[in-house]
């Protein structure tokens, strides 16, 4: 428990630092990788909706029935939308309050580029609220989920998984989101593919939803 609380304190400091170093115009802009809390749980923002800046997404299991308020530290930023919740991809939408903007990027301000399909053996990274950026190898892939050898901890649920064209390049290609750790294989996490998320959100919004 002490290790988790220490990690949580470090994550809060990272979020505060990101806000402090942002320009005034977007100092509170919610990006992929931000830590959010609700009902005593903390999770990670997966990504803002590229077509609707008032919507962001996170892991569905972060929603506790009856508790819709979502906060960033002591700032109330929005509410879960229980109607936009998909157990299959473990995704849920959050509607931001009118005074809370979003930015289509990582916390590092790297823009989110067109999504990619994860491939077995490729190197991917994630930005989680607790462990920040860690990278690892894709172990297996199917139509809706994939497994990655990668460090993660409580609070990283919902974190975006992405690839870079090359080290130091500006912009990342999202390939999925973190669901959970594998209880039988330490250091392995399960993720939803961006393709499965795309299908769910296209049906939900009644349009050809895409991260492009």
Where are the language model's segments positioned?
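Catalytic histidine site
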Residues: 28-99, 140-212
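Short, structured beta-strand/loop micro-motifs enriched in basic residues and often containing a Trp
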Residues: 100-110
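Solvent-exposed, flexible loop/coil residues
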Residues: 5, 67, 116
């Amino acid at each position: 428990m002490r290790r988790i609380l220490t990690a949580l304190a470090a994550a809060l400091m990272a979020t505060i630092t990101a806000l402090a170093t942002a320009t005034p115009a977007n100092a509170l802009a919610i990006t992929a990788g931000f830590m959010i809390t609700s009902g005593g749980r903390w999770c990670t923002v997966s990504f803002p909706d590229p077509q609707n800046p008032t919507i962001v997404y996170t892991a569905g299991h972060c929603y506790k029935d009856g508790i819709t308020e979502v906060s960033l530290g002591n700032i109330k930023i929005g509410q879960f939308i229980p109607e936009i919740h998909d157990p299959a991809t473990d995704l849920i939408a959050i509607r931001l309050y009118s005074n809370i903007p979003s930015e289509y990027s990582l916390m590092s301000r790297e823009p989110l580029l067109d999504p990619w399909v994860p491939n077995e053996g490729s190197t991917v990274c994630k930005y989680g609220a607790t462990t920040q950026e860690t990278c690892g190898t894709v172990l297996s892939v199917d139509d809706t989920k994939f497994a990655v050898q990668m460090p993660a901890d409580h609070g990283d649920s919902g974190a975006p998984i992405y690839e870079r064209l090359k080290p130091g390049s500006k912009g990342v290609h999202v390939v999925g989101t973190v669901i959970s750790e594998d209880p039988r294989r330490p250091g392995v996490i399960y993720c939803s593919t961006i393709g499965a998320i795309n299908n769910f959100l296209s049906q939900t919004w009644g349009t050809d939803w895409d991260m492009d």
